[in-house]
Amino acid sequence: AGGHRVRVVGNLDDAQPADVVVVVNPNNPDGQTYSPGVLISWAEKLAAKGGLLVVDQAFTDPTPELSLASKADISGLILLHSFGKFFGLAGLRLGFASGNQETISLLKRKLGPWAVSGPALEIGARAYGDEDWATETRSRLARDRARLDQILSENDFEIIGGTDLFRLGAHEKAGQIYHLLGEAGILVRPFPDYPKWLRFGLPGNDVAFSRLAAALGGLSGE
């Protein structure tokens, strides 16, 4: 943590009296969100005492109304962006930070050059410029998220939250379900500190949805 004293809190209101606050918005894995207005207020309060708000927007692209991109020039704010989550090209290894000129200049001096390949820059620029694809993908993800929620609910999962890219559910037999799904070739994420939780990525197509539904249905029938 670079010599900083780090405190992990579950709610932004509990972050006082920190000078630097890092918020993942939406949060992974529970999908907790804060409105742009709340985050801007925090950035202004922190900037007034020489502090900084860092907002990780890795999972914001499906819900652009949560993005602070249009406010990136205010003092005391750094936004972190991840290309691979929304565009499905994690191997491209492309991400970036945005903020006002003074903040970004300071960040560049502290971090030094960060290598990004030419193909990654070209693919990223084209992808971010394809607004029609982004609009259609957001609609599809919202539909698929609702479809996944239905499958999980039908198999006795409590939907805790998530985003339009993944869902977090709780089940009394989560540990057993994790192993049996793995044997069926379906990988989900467990949480050792929360043994009832499983995180599900959105199935990629109708066949994958059917496989998941059949696997969970078979488990519940045992």
Locations of the language-model features?
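PLP-dependent enzyme catalytic core of the Aspartate aminotransferase-like
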Residues: 35-37, 183, 193-222
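PLP-dependent aminotransferase class I/II
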Residues: 76-152, 157-159
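Conserved PLP-binding catalytic core of the aspartate aminotransferase-like
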Residues: 142, 152-184, 202, 206
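Helix C-cap/helix->beta junction micro-motif
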Residues: 2, 48-49, 74-75, 155
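Hydrophobic residues in well-ordered beta-strands that form the structural core
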Residues: 8, 55, 81, 188-190
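A general structural detector for well-ordered alpha-helical segments in enzyme core domains, enriched
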Residues: 38-42, 68, 148, 177, ...
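Active-site phosphate-binding strand-loop segment of PLP-dependent enzymes
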Residues: 4-62
